[in-house]
UniProtKB/Swiss-Prot annotation:
Its main location: plastid. HAMAP family: MatK. This is Maturase K. Belongs to the intron maturase 2 family. MatK subfamily. It comes from Lilium canadense (Canada lily).
Length: 512
């Protein structure tokens, strides 16, 4: 990141308004293809057979010129159909490589205004640098502290824009370079037309994987716009004076005001925003899923859902189904978020109160934030990865049988340690032990398949040596902190939650 900021200091005052010339700078493509600077966790390199992937700025200039020709898309598709089974160097893949190069370089360029704004904002506010602030596990201590005091929660699936032009219009507020916006439109429509025109499923898959960094940047810009306006409206509604409850008695008057909720005018905030006035509301989002929790009533959450549906319809010009927002009470509802099932438990207690010679019992309840590992989705992810059946029965992975014994054990152990590291925040570890058992037995059967033996004979020969590969660092540390607790049993019951603040992305098996 420091190297990235060093390049951004060049002509810093001109970059926001003149981004297009940066496409012809070689260091832009160096940044785009540097794995250490690639912030996308979905980055997957694509290899081209028969092409040496050499880079030339002269060919990039020619490609940009040719891309604006009307027959470029038709020629590209026809050439791919002619050379699909050719044994020589494929001209289509060479052009695809340069198109991929330009699009990835363009991804770096459009991020420059946002990177500069983020750096300048952190410098003005003097925000201390901390890796813990970037951990996705930092969300769970926040939920643990807040959800137990709230009443209702709304589980939101953020809809995707149905038209690319909406994404371009969002960026127009931050990027004033017109040629860059035109090039962005061309990229988006090219991808859309190729997916509709090319009939090969393999080619569609390659193009869908071509530049996830650009598409995730556009999607995050869209979500950022939604959240910016949400925070703005919420702040404005909090400044309004209280509305008399008498207005709720007349239903026609109530719905009359609800119809004007999407009209935003500085002089009319009191009319438009009072139905969603809620000073105590919490919003958490990860990727395309968000949580809106409040201490208010169920009716208030319905108003927020009404507001969201109308907001997406009138501001982003697409319809979002109301069922994408599930409203439930926190006391009897479990919702899935970031690989966990979250819920609020009520533990009743009887407290004995002694006053002089009289004593009496006081019934009270304590709300507790509970986190559970969803075993069924995890087993489904393991079955898709060919570690077990859909019922959770461990099976061998023959595709790994060609590796050495050390590589096989290391692969299984790394998957197991990563899952344990991510799910150590669970209050109950039985599901985690079952996942470990599946991976351990799948590893044994893979080794047995390689050596033409049985899993039972292999486990008897290896003993506990294979089991040690599946122990996590957290368990070894806890063995010193809690020496009286048996941590390595499959049927243990441990309730110590450990949130790891070094996790910056969700595990692929968890996210399926």
């Amino acid at each position: 990141m420091e190297e990235f900021q060093g390049y951004l200091k060049k002509d810093r005052s001109l970059q926001q308004h003149f981004l297009y010339p940066l496409l012809l700078q070689e260091y832009i493509y160096t940044l785009a293809h540097d794995d250490s600077l690639n912030g996308s966790i979905f980055y997957e390199p694509i290899e081209f057979i028969g092409y040496d992937n050499k880079f030339s700025l002269v060919l990039v200039k020619r490609l940009i010129t040719r891309m604006y020709q009307q027959n470029f898309l038709i020629y590209l598709v026809n050439d791919s159909n002619q050379n699909r089974f050719g044994g020589h160097t494929n001209y289509f893949y060479s052009h695809f490589f340069y198109s991929k190069m330009v699009s990835k370089g363009f991804s770096v360029i459009v991020e420059i205004p946002f990177s500069l704004r983020l750096v300048s904002s952190s410098e003005e506010k003097e925000i201390p640098k901390s890796q813990n602030l970037g951990s996705i596990h930092s969300i769970f201590p926040f939920l643990e502290d807040k959800l137990s005091h709230l009443n209702n929660v709304s589980d939101i699936l953020i809809p995707h824009p149905i038209h690319f032009e909406i994404l371009v219009q969002i960026l127009q507020c931050w990027i004033q370079d017109v040629p860059s916006l035109h090039l962005l439109r061309f990229f988006l429509h090219k991808y859309q037309n190729l997916n509709k025109t090319i009939q090969s499923n393999k080619t569609i898959y390659v193009f869908s994987k071509e530049n996830k960094r650009l598409f995730w940047f556009l999607y995050n810009s869209y979500v950022s716009e939604c959240e910016f306006l949400l925070v703005f409206f919420h702040k404005q509604s909090c400044y309004l004076r209280s509305t008399s409850s008498g207005a709720f008695l007349e239903r026609s008057h109530f719905y009359g005001k609800m119809e004007h909720i999407i009209i935003v005018c500085c002089n009319n905030f009191q009319k438009t925003l009072w139905p969603v006035k809620d000073p105590l509301i919490h919003y958490v989002r990860y990727q395309g899923k968000a949580i809106l929790a409040s201490r208010g009533t169920h009716l208030l959450m319905k108003k927020w859902r009404y507001y969201f549906v109308n907001f997406w319809q009138y501001y982003f010009h697409f319809w979002s189904q109301p069922y994408r927002m599930h409203i439930n009470s926190l006391l009897n509802y479990s919702f899935y978020f970031m690989g966990y099932l979250l819920r609020v438990l009520i533990n009743p207690y009887a407290v004995k109160n002694q006053m002089l010679e009289n004593s009496f019992l006081i019934d009270t309840v304590i709300k507790k934030f509970d986190t559970i590992i969803p075993i069924i989705p995890l087993i489904g992810s393991l079955s898709k990865a060919k570690f077990c059946t859909f019922s959770g029965h461990p099976i061998s992975k023959p595709i790994w049988a060609d590796f050495s014994d050390f590589d096989i054990i290391d692969r299984f152990g790394r998957i197991c340690r990563n899952l344990s590291h991510y799910h150590n925040g669970s209050s109950k570890k039985q599901s985690l032990y079952r996942i470990k058992y599946i991976l351990r037995l799948s590893c044994a059967r893979t080794l047995a398949c390689k050596h033409k033996s049985t899993a039972r004979a292999l486990l008897q020969r290896l003993g506990s040596g294979l089991l040690e590969e599946f122990f996590t660092e957290e368990e070894q540390v806890l063995s010193f902190i809690f020496p009286k607790t048996t941590l390595f049993t499959l049927h243990g019951s441990h309730r110590e939650r450990i949130w790891s603040l070094d996790i910056i992305r969700i595990n692929d098996l968890v996210n399926n």
